[in-house]
Amino acid sequence: MPQPWTVAARNLAEHVNNPIHTDAGARAAGFPSALEAGVTTYAYLTHPVVAAWGTEWLTRGGGEMRFRAPVFAGRSIDCVPTSDRDGAVTVEAIDATEPSNPRAVLTAVIDSGPPPERRAGDELDPRRYVLDERYGPDYGARAGDDLAVYGRDDVVHPAVWPAIANNVVQTGLVTGSWIHTRSIVRHHAIARRGDEVDVYATVVDRFVRHGQRAVLDVVIARSGRPVATLEHEAIVDLSVA
């Protein structure tokens, strides 16, 4: 049974590229202070799952992450897991100083199944990433996830996959503040420090709901074989009503 875990929310150095993760940018968008990057909130919520399920989840598990309300940098966040009857685990991010909770929810499963078929849409240029530094095993430690498996075994942290998808959004779809709202992440193999991966992203939907949103299918492959696949949603233009 996964156990609760508490961490202090923080933003990493690379997140200042999105103004919403700075106090000034967040206030300009109507928030009281800097929003923590959703991918870092995801990193926290994976902690109870990996502590309980280990590398099996990193190899073939996955889950759906939904961001319901902002997590503000500097706050204490409780990651509270519950087990469902079907074997899934739901982990909620709780900020005890806020009246509305949970702030975010991860529903994790031990077997996420095979890679889904790629859908038609607007294909973005392929990219290649080296899984090290900001996209390597150390992501969790920098964010506050203290599980030893990543540094000890050079296993890439699961938050790297939505972090890569976020980089695709940041550099390919937006020009100002934007917000990551949802991801479905499926793991298909372990990745380790220094691996090179090719990333193929397709914009499969655009719609307006509290801003202009984009939904991407993202395939992250090593030597032609998927390591992770994602359905990744973000508000890419906050100025659209």
What is the role of each PLM region?
Residues 1-60, 113-182, 241:
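Hot-dog-fold acyl-thioester-processing enzymes
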Residues 1-7, 67-131, 190-241:
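HotDog/MaoC-like acyl-thioester-processing domains
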Residues 60-61, 73:
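General structural concept
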Residues 62-67, 182-188:
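Short structured motifs
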